[in-house]
From Swiss-Prot:
The gene is pdxH. Homodimer. Catalyzes the oxidation of either pyridoxine 5'-phosphate (PNP) or pyridoxamine 5'-phosphate (PMP) into pyridoxal 5'-phosphate (PLP). The keyword Flavoprotein applies. It is an enzyme of class 1 (oxidoreductase). Its cofactor is FMN. Keywords: Flavoprotein, FMN, Oxidoreductase, Pyridoxine biosynthesis. This is Pyridoxine/pyridoxamine 5'-phosphate oxidase.
Length: 201
């Protein structure tokens, strides 16, 4: 149940703060990619798909990741702009799930993040026709050579490459307990605002 005296914004800020605390603890472990999570989407045909993405930003506006918009995930999000992102931190025995409605980030946001990427990753975004069939590895390497020669200096952001923001409707925190009596808490946005409650494990 929602704590007495806490307004909706305060509850939401508490949820975000707790996720950031988990991420900080994860960064202190030997996890190679502490911001890696499984993104689940569902397409027009009703079939789900899941894949690993990197959480690049988390603030009041939501959780941001970047990808090729022509990929399967991009196509599914165009058809059904809802997603769940699950981050599992094995060394901590903790997990975070963020569910929400998905919207594209602004072009300026995408440009800022693109400028931070290493050159090979930028070239790869041009060379890879993500999620499309590939005849051979040689085909991909040939496209990489072609874009290397096309962009000898600055690599512009491809029009098909951008970011998505999951605007949360729920944030769930899980931590392992003895006898599988785990601790589960959910922050959820309803018609009257954000609330916080426990869940049975």
């Amino acid at each position: 149940m929602t704590e007495p005296g806490m307004d909706s914004d305060t509850i939401y800020q508490e949820a975000l703060s707790r996720v950031h605390q988990v991420l900080e603890r994860a960064r202190a472990t030997d996890l190679p990619e502490p911001t890696a999570g499984i993104l689940a989407t569902v397409g027009r045909d009703g079939w789900p798909a899941a894949r690993t993405v990197l959480l690049k930003q988390l603030d009041e506006q939501g959780a941001v990741f970047y990808t090729n918009r022509a990929s399967r995930k991009g196509q599914q999000l165009a058809d059904n702009p809802r997603a769940a992102l699950c981050l599992h931190f094995q060394p901590l025995y903790e997990q975070v799930e963020i569910r929400g409605v998905v919207a594209a980030v602004s072009a300026s946001e995408a440009d800022r993040y693109w400028a931070q990427r290493e050159r090979l990753s930028q070239l790869g975004a041009w060379a890879s026709h993500q999620s499309e069939p590939l005849a051979s590895r040689h085909e991909l390497e040939a496209r990489l050579e072609e874009v290397e020669s096309r962009f000898p200096e600055r690599v512009p952001r491809p029009p098909h490459w951008s970011g998505y923001r999951i605007i949360p409707v729920s944030i769930e925190l899980w931590s392992a307990g003895d006898g599988r009596l785990h601790q589960r808490e959910r922050y959820e946005h309803r018609t009257d605002g954000w609330s916080h409650f426990l869940l049975n494990p």
